[in-house]
């Protein structure tokens, strides 16, 4: 085959020798001489060969090494983030932990381990002194976070007839797990730590299907029922005793990148219920307190308190002939 040239001047293989040329010399050539083929007939198309470590591979390796020298390359792995999230949630709620120890000495040791691990992970995005300070501040905030989470769990028990106990909600409800991780990530985000809060949020997102940006502000006693597909944007503000069903989106209208840092997501006031697949968009959109937003509603304007907003389905009664024909919808 022809020589395959790769970046850097290396060759993957020498040109193949034509076995017929020496046995059957062409007219005009000496005995045993090798005749040259016309360029158009030189050889078949090159076949894929092994990569050349002196050419393209070296260029790729150099690029990968350079990437690993950046700060991004030193971020904690997904496995490490998941382990920390599980440890933090398990510390607050033993229903989500396999560690049954409950004495003071053991719990204090676990808290210190969490602080040290968080500071270590923060080294990738903050200076060492700032990393230790931020980790300590998050640990100091845990009592207030725990208090809010107890109120969240109680709201789910009260709001879901299928929930039989507080223990069941804490141990089994994906909505509660997502809220727990969010409250930790939100505090870390408030303390100014970059990137890591988002990694925490994505750990919960991957596990529950609930996507809450760590920048979102959420009041007390949030009830998430089912939860799959919920999206809450960065600048969303949610009041107290709000109830969200699956598929709810609190999002932004399409904006330019220059709008980053501005309020792009809606405000949901106290005691609002948003039913399945309701979509509320825009930073100027305010849903007034004690309102109900029905399923499949698309809302981009504010509504006053005590509003009931619903989507009206179109109902068409078919005649008998239509009913006996092909269905309008198929799966």
Segments the model singles out, each with a brief description of its role:
Residues 280, 318, 322-329:
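C-terminal membrane-proximal segments flanking the terminal transmembrane helix
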Residues 208, 213-214, 219-220, 225-234, ...:
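Left-handed beta-helix
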Residues 189-193, 205-209, 223:
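Short helix-capping and hinge/turn segments at secondary-structure transitions, especially at repeat
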Residues 205, 217, 257:
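Short acidic loop-to-helix transition motifs that present clustered carboxylates
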Residues 95, 250-256:
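Short regulatory "switch" loops immediately downstream of catalytic or recognition motifs
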Residues 1-202, 324-331:
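Terminal amphipathic alpha-helical/low-complexity segments used for targeting or macromolecular assembly
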Residues 192-195, 263-267:
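Short, positively charged
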Residues 257-263:
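Extended hydrophobic/aromatic segments used for targeting, binding, or gating
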């Amino acid at each position: 085959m022809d020589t395959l040239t790769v970046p850097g001047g290396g060759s993957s293989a020498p040109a193949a020798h034509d076995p017929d040329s020496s046995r059957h010399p062409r007219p005009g050539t000496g005995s045993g001489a090798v005749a040259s083929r016309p360029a158009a007939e030189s050889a078949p198309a090159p076949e894929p060969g092994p990569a050349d470590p002196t050419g393209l591979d070296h260029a790729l390796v150099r690029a990968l090494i350079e990437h690993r020298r950046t700060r991004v390359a030193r971020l904690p792995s997904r496995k490490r983030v998941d382990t920390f999230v599980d440890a933090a949630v398990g510390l607050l709620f033993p229903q989500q932990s396999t560690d049954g120890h409950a004495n003071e000495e053991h719990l204090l040791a676990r808290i210190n381990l969490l602080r040290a691990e968080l500071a270590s992970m923060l080294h990738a995005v903050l200076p060492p002194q700032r990393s230790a300070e931020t980790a300590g501040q998050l640990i100091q905030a845990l009592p207030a976070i725990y208090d809010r989470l107890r109120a969240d769990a109680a709201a789910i028990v009260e709001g879901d007839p299928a929930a039989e106990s507080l223990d069941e909600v804490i141990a089994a409800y994906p909505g509660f797990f997502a809220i727990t991780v969010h409250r930790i990530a939100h505090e870390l985000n408030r303390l100014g730590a970059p990137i890591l809060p988002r990694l925490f949020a994505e750990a919960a997102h991957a596990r529950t299907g609930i996507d809450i940006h760590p920048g979102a502000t959420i009041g007390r006693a949030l009830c998430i029922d089912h939860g799959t597909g919920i999206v809450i944007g960065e600048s969303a503000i949610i009041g107290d005793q709000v109830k969200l069903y699956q598929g709810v989106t609190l999002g932004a209208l399409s904006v330019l990148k220059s709008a980053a840092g501005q309020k792009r997501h809606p405000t949901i006031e106290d005691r609002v219920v948003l039913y399945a697949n309701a979509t509320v968009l825009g930073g100027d959109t305010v849903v007034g307190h004690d309102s109900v937003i029905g399923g499949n509603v698309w809302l981009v304007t504010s509504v006053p308190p005590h509003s009931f907003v619903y989507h009206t389905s179109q109902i068409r009664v078919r005649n008998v002939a239509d009913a006996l024909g092909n269905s309008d919808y198929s799966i």
